[in-house]
Curated annotation (Swiss-Prot):
Designated name of the protein: [LysW]-aminoadipate kinase
Source species taxonomy: Bacteria, Thermotogati, Deinococcota, Deinococci, Thermales
Consequence recorded when altering K113E: Loss of activity
Localization, UniProt: Cytoplasm
Pathway participation: Amino-acid biosynthesis; L-lysine biosynthesis via AAA pathway; L-lysine from L-alpha-aminoadipate (Thermus route): step 2/5
EC number: 2.7.2.17
Gene assigned in the entry: lysZ
Reactions catalysed, as given in the entry: [amino-group carrier protein]-C-terminal-N-(1,4-dicarboxybutan-1-yl)-L-glutamine + ATP = [amino-group carrier protein]-C-terminal-N-(1-carboxy-5-phosphooxy-5-oxopentan-1-yl)-L-glutamine + ADP
Database matches in PANTHER family: [LYSW]-AMINOADIPATE KINASE (PTHR23342:SF20), N-ACETYLGLUTAMATE SYNTHASE (PTHR23342)
Length: 269
C-alpha cells in the first residue's frame, strides 16, 4: 500500500499525478490518494465575495478560518471541483477511480474543536464557532471493500463530527492516519516544492534525507514553512505509527509518485 497526499497549492500538475497513479494502479499497486484544494478554494471564495481568512496558531501552523459559508465553499471545491477533476483524469488514464469525502459512509469521523487558539499582533487569542476538527476514526471496512473490488479511492476532507456536522480537517493528518492504519510501504506528500528546503524558497537547498529517528529534531521542524508544517507533523505522526518511509516530493514534474519512491525529494527513513 502507498498513500499519496496531493497538495492543493498553485502549480500542482494534476495530469502528471493522475497518469502516474493510474500506471501504478494498473501494475497492481494498492493506492490511496488524498488531496487538498486550498488555492482553488481561495479563488472561488474571492469570486463569491467571501474572501479567505487564515489563523496562525501558537505552534506556527496556519489554518483556514472556517465559518459556515466558508465550509460550503470548501465543500464545493474539495468534494466537487478538485475531487471530480482527479477522478476524471484517472478514468481517462484507465484507472477505475472513485471519489469520496469524509462525509460519505462516515469515512472520516472526528471531534469538532470548540475553540481555536491563534496569534494576532503577538497575543494569543481564542476563536469560537469554527467548523474545524481532527479525524479520530476511519471507516476502514468501506475502504477495504473498495480496494478489494479493484477501485482506486480518491479521498478528501471534510470529515464528519460526532454531532454529524461537516468539519474542515487537515488532509495531511488524514494521509498520515491512513498510512499508519494500513502499514503503508510509503507515505508520499506531493506539493509545489521539491521537498523540505534548508533555505526556503531556494530549491537548490533541498534536504535529501532525514533519519527517521531525527524527524522531530528542532532543526528539521524549523525547516517547515507555512502549510508545510502540517506535512511535517503528518510525517511525525506516520513515523510514530510505524510507517517506514515518508517522502516530501515535487508535484510539478512528470512521474511524481515514481520519482518520489525512487528517492527524489526529501526522504524520511
Amino acid at each position: 500500500m502507498i498513500v499519496v497526499k496531493v497538495g492543493g497549492a498553485e502549480g500542482i500538475n494534476y495530469e502528471a499525478v493522475a497518469k502516474d497513479a493510474a500506471s501504478l494502479w494498473k501494475e497492481g499497486v494498492k493506492l490511496l490518494l488524498v488531496h487538498g484544494g486550498s488555492a482553488e478554494t481561495n479563488k472561488v471564495a474571492e469570486a463569491l465575495g467571501h474572501p479567505p481568512r487564515f489563523l496562525t496558531h501558537p505552534g506556527g501552523q496556519v489554518s483556514r478560518l472556517t465559518d459556515r459559508k466558508t465550509l460550503e465553499i470548501f465543500e464545493m471545491v474539495y468534494c466537487g471541483l478538485v475531487n471530480k477533476r482527479l477522478v476524471e483524469l484517472l478514468q481517462k488514464e484507465g484507472a477505475n477511480a472513485i471519489g469520496l469525502s469524509g462525509l460519505d459512509g462516515r469515512l472520516f469521523v472526528g471531534r469538532r474543536k470548540t475553540a481555536v487558539k491563534y496569534v494576532e499582533n503577538g497575543k494569543v487569542k481564542v476563536h469560537r464557532g469554527d467548523y474545524t476538527g481532527t479525524v479520530e476514526e476511519v471507516n476502514k471496512a468501506l475502504l477495504d471493500l473498495l480496494l478489494q473490488a479493484g477501485y482506486l479511492p480518491v479521498l478528501t476532507p471534510p470529515a464528519l463530527s460526532y454531532e454529524n456536522e461537516a468539519i474542515n480537517t487537515d488532509g495531511d493528518q488524514i494521509a498520515a492516519l491512513l498510512a499508519t492504519l494500513y502499514g503503508a510501504e510509503a507515505l508520499v506528500y506531493l506539493s509545489n516544492v521539491p521537498g523540505l528546503l534548508a533555505r526556503y524558497p531556494d530549491e537548490a537547498s533541498l534536504v535529501r534525507e532525514i533519519p527517521v529517528e531525527r524527524i522531530e529534531d528542532p532543526e528539521y521542524l524549523a525547516l517547515a514553512q507555512g502549510r508545510m508544517k502540517r506535512k511535517v507533523m503528518g510525517a511525525v505522526e506516520a513515523v510514530r505509527g510505524g510507517v517506514k518511509r515518508v517522502v516530501f516530493a515535487d508535484a510539478r514534474v512528470e512521474n511524481p509518485i515514481r520519482r518520489a519512491l525512487s528517492g527524489e525529494g526529501t526522504v524520511v527513513r
